[in-house]
Amino acid sequence: MPFACYFFIFINVGLGEGSALPVGVPVPWPSATPPTGWLKCNGAAFSAEEYPELAKAYPTNKLPDLRGEFIRGWDDGRGIDTGRSILSIQGYATEDHAHGLPSRSTIVTDATINFYFDEIWVNSGTDIIKRGNTNDAGLPAPDYGTFKTYKQSVDGLGAAASETRPRNIAFNYIVRAA
């Protein structure tokens, strides 16, 4: 986007001197370079003498590092995300969940079901033969039918990645410094 377009946005949304936005409020910005009087939220330290109003919002004199991060509303007693404080960082997590595995087992308690991974048990008609991984680590052989290899992965489904994330668009978070 040409500079004139950024300047137009800067003037028309009140990002300049006398802005209605308070000092320290993170704002998504569609450029790598913040406008004059604004700083990137990149974890950098700043001078409280140079930016006294910013130091009131960030008393550690360090901006939050919002590069590659999502902002989440503070729980403030709601009970959705308990134990957090303002400006605290929360790491990656995937919600605990379970997947059912098909089984012909007659055992009814989850605690006693054995699953065999990376191996296949084949009923030859006269015997049950283990194929694939032959290191059974002391697990007993099943006394029925065929076990299939189970793999818990989304790789190859078009959405596999090294993290869990919603769809998103990248912006540069900036704060008004003075």
Swiss-Prot record:
Signal peptide coordinates: none
Source domain of life: Bacteria
UniProt keyword annotation of Repeat present: yes
Listed InterPro entries: Phage_tail_collar_dom, Phage_tail_collar_dom_sf, Phage_Tail_Fiber_Structural
Keywords, in A-Z order: Repeat
Pfam families: Collar (PF07484)
Similarity-based family: Belongs to the tail fiber family.
Name this protein carries in UniProt: Putative uncharacterized protein StfE
Biological source species: Escherichia coli (strain K12)
Gene that this polypeptide is encoded by: stfE
